[in-house]
């Protein structure tokens, strides 16, 4: 029996010896569970692309390679652990031909834990939650620690955004508030973690995000861009680094989301005041980032009663989702079920929020979005227009984000994870109750050009004792019509038809002006002609099958 020279000691060929040593180490460490060869080769190649900073290949490996291998090999089990991967790719000390793999291992673990979160039906264990957060801490430590020169690392935009997004989202707060998700053994561990604040905690999260802003000088650079200046003039080597610029940029949106989840809507908008709703923005390169940005900015405006501004932002986002629907469906199929369909879920939420905004402040929107809105929520909008507070509650709960209470820890008893949502919902409904008659009030005002306040009060069955509060509600409607204090995010000089009604009160008389914008009939026909031409063009491209003579 002749033995292959490769199956034994050294051959004298450095490349074959290195391959043998790597394979030998991998098999020794994975005696209980052999890593498939495809996975081992994928990891080795992935690390090499990280070392070479080949962003195009990294993007392909991240977006397609990892989900594909997950679908093939890891439906019922987890990816190899850290030690196994180190032995596959080489740890630096054991295999001298490979550079130190610390950064790659951290990045691999980021994918590993994301897979853990999607695969475990009852949620990850406390140990996994702890290790996942510590891994993010290590990653940002590598980014923020250098003082003289930036970290030598390049990653695709979508991965950088996912890192920030997952870091902000970490559902540890929901886990802490729900004793039903914990085993009895995890009680003591959670107590220790909370005392040391060594898992997801709002203060270090905010500290890291603001540190990324400072390190990248992103606010100064965005301000320079808006003013037409060269951003490099206000940035140092870190700010000019693509890695730091993008992390800082996405951290702004991460902070926006964090402040919204905490219920601080003014600070949320203040955080992104230098980010414009611009089709050339960096967030446009990552669809889920674009949708997240629009959703949270629009939601903040809605909670601050800027319903007209919120409507415009929601409609723009829905139009984007509508235009890219086929592309997103294709991407989601390629990713299998590894990554959550953020865009699909947000699309549904946007319609519920848009229904609230248009009920409180009607305005003309895109025809295609309006038809979809009435199809989905038409009956609900009718109920809300008639003052049904329960429909407002349901629409809010179906459209709002998962609010956080970072300090809440429940060691035993009922699930308290929904308490933050209920607090925000109740605060929102208090505002709505003060405006609940506004849609009805608007209906009466549209029937007149002048109307005494007493007569309007009698129409709405307002008693003399409640007359003063009724006048207050009238002034509230006036404020909504004018959108006092509105801060427009896009700062674009466009035709802004926010409402079709305006009025003022002169002593005891209401003077109403119908400001309805005339429908652009010519524009409508032009759009329909373009659609007809497109249909004709497609029909002409179809092959013509000759009729078969009988």
UniProtKB/Swiss-Prot annotation:
**What GO molecular functions are on record for this protein?**
translation initiation factor activity
Please give the superkingdom of this protein's source: Eukaryota
Residues in domain PCI? Answer: 309-503
InterPro entries for the chain: eIF3l, PCI_dom
Keyword field contains Protein biosynthesis: yes
Specify where it is mainly localized.
cytoplasm
Q: Disordered: where is this region?
A: 1-20
Task of the protein: Component of the eukaryotic translation initiation factor 3 (eIF-3) complex, which is involved in protein synthesis of a specialized repertoire of mRNAs and, together with other initiation factors, stimulates binding of mRNA and methionyl-tRNAi to the 40S ribosome. The eIF-3 complex specifically targets and initiates translation of a subset of mRNAs involved in cell proliferation.
- The protein's name: Eukaryotic translation initiation factor 3 subunit L
Native species: Brugia malayi
């Amino acid at each position: 029996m002749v033995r292959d020279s490769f199956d034994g000691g050294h051959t004298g060929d450095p490349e074959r010896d290195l391959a043998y040593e790597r394979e030998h180490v991998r098999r020794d460490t994975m005696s209980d569970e052999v890593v498939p060869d495809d996975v081992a080769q994928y990891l080795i190649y992935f690390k090499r692309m990280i070392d070479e900073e080949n962003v195009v290949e990294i993007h392909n490996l991240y977006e397609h390679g990892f989900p594909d291998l997950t679908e093939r090999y890891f439906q019922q089990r987890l990816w190899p652990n850290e030690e196994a991967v180190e032995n596959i790719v080489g740890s630096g000390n054991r295999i001298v031909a490979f550079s130190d793999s610390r950064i790659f291992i951290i990045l691999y673990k980021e994918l590993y834990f994301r897979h853990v979160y999607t695969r475990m039906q009852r949620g990850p264990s406390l140990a996994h939650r702890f290790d996942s957060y510590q891994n993010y801490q290590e990653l940002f430590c590598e980014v923020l620690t250098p003082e003289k020169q930036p970290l030598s690392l390049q990653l695709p935009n979508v991965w950088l955004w996912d890192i920030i997004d997952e870091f902000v989202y970490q559902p540890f707060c929901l886990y802490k508030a729900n004793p039903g998700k914990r085993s009895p053994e995890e009680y003591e561990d959670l107590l220790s973690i909370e005392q040391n604040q060594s898992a997801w905690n709002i203060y270090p999260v905010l500290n890291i995000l603001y540190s990324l802003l400072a390190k990248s000088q992103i606010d100064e650079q965005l301000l320079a861009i808006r003013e037409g200046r060269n951003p490099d003039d206000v940035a140092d080597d870190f700010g000019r680094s693509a890695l730091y610029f993008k992390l800082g940029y996405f951290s702004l949106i991460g902070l926006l989301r964090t402040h919204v989840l905490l219920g601080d809507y003014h600070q949320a908008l203040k955080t992104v005041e230098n980010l414009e709703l611009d089709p050339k923005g960096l967030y446009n390169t990552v669809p889920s980032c674009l949708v997240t940005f629009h959703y949270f900015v629009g939601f903040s405006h809605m909670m601050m009663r800027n319903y007209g501004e919120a409507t415009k932002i929601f409609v723009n986002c829905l139009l984007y989702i509508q235009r890219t629907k086929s592309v997103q469906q294709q991407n989601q199929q390629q990713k299998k079920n590894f990554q959550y369909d953020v865009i699909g879920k947000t699309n549904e939420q946007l319609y519920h929020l848009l229904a609230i905004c248009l009920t409180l402040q009607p305005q003309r929107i895109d025809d295609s979005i309006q038809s979809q809105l009435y199809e989905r929520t038409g009956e609900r909008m009718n109920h809300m227009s008639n003052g049904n507070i329960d429909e407002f509650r349901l629409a809010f709960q179906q459209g709002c984000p998962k609010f956080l209470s970072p300090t809440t820890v429940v060691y035993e008893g009922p699930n308290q994870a929904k308490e933050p949502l209920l607090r925000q919902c109740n605060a929102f409904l208090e505002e709505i109750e003060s405006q609940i008659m506004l849609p009805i009030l608007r209906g009466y005002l549209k029937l007149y050009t002048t109307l005494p306040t007493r007569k309007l009060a009698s129409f709405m069955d307002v008693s003399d004792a409640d007359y003063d509060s009724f006048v207050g509600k009238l002034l509230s409607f006036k404020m909504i019509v004018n959108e006092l204090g509105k801060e427009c995010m896009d700062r674009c000089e466009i035709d802004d038809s926010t409402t079709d009604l305006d009025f003022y009160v002169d002593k005891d008389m209401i003077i109403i002006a119908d400001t309805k914008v005339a429908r652009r009939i010519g524009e409508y026909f032009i759009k329909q002609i373009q659609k007809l031409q497109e249909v004709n063009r497609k029909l002409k491209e179809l092959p013509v099958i000759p009729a078969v003579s009988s």
